[in-house]
Amino acid sequence: MSERIAEVSRDTLETQIRVRINLDGQGKGQFDTGLPFLDHMLDQVARHGVVDLEIVAKGDLHIDAHHTVEDIGITLGQAMARALGDKKGIRRYGHAYVPLDEALSRVVVDFSGRPGLEYHVDYPRARIGDFDVDLFGEFFQGFVNHAAVTLHIDNLRGRNAHHVAETIFKAFGRALRMAAEPDPRMQGTTPSTKGSL
């Protein structure tokens, strides 16, 4: 399998985003989004997905964080799709349950080529620090649309909003890792009866 590395830049009048991902990395992350709590969540994806991930973002945070968070999701999705290439030889499906104290979340992903998000999370409060938790849904929608994956995210329980978010992002990383992992029994084969994804 060739190197699974991609770098994508996205520049609009609202944001400038750069993402670099190595799917066969060591879990190293570098983040500068202007949103410290989002940086913390993205670091969970790198570490638990065991991917090397660099994200630099400049956005219109003087308005709010919506454009920046959504566009990071979009650009990460584009980078993921590019790094995966034709998806031959991967496992395709991934899932993870992750607990953190009282919180428990489940994430299931399918590198199907069909964008779809089922996001079922009721945060116990609207903000974590100064971060608007509604924006996590925008992040995942942007990712799904541009990675062309089906993604199910369910928070099963949790009273602490920080714990809820962290379990989601850790499970997201672990599910991505499982789905993108090379399957030695599928070398050179697309994991679909259609012959393409």
Swiss-Prot record:
Keywords in alphabetical order: Amino-acid biosynthesis, Cytoplasm, Histidine biosynthesis, Lyase
Organism listed in the record: Thioalkalivibrio sulfidiphilus (strain HL-EbGR7)
Pathway per the UniProt entry: Amino-acid biosynthesis; L-histidine biosynthesis; L-histidine from 5-phospho-alpha-D-ribose 1-diphosphate: step 6/9
Pfam families in the cross-refs: IGPD (PF00475)
Protein name: Imidazoleglycerol-phosphate dehydratase
PROSITE patterns: IGP_DEHYDRATASE_1, IGP_DEHYDRATASE_2
Catalytic activity, EC: 4.2.1.19
GO molecular function, one term: imidazoleglycerol-phosphate dehydratase activity
Main location: cytoplasm
InterPro entries found in the cross-reference section: IGPD_sf (IPR038494), ImidazoleglycerolP_deHydtase (IPR000807), ImidazoleglycerP_deHydtase_CS (IPR020565), Ribosomal_Su5_D2-typ_SF (IPR020568)
CDD domains the record matches: IGPD
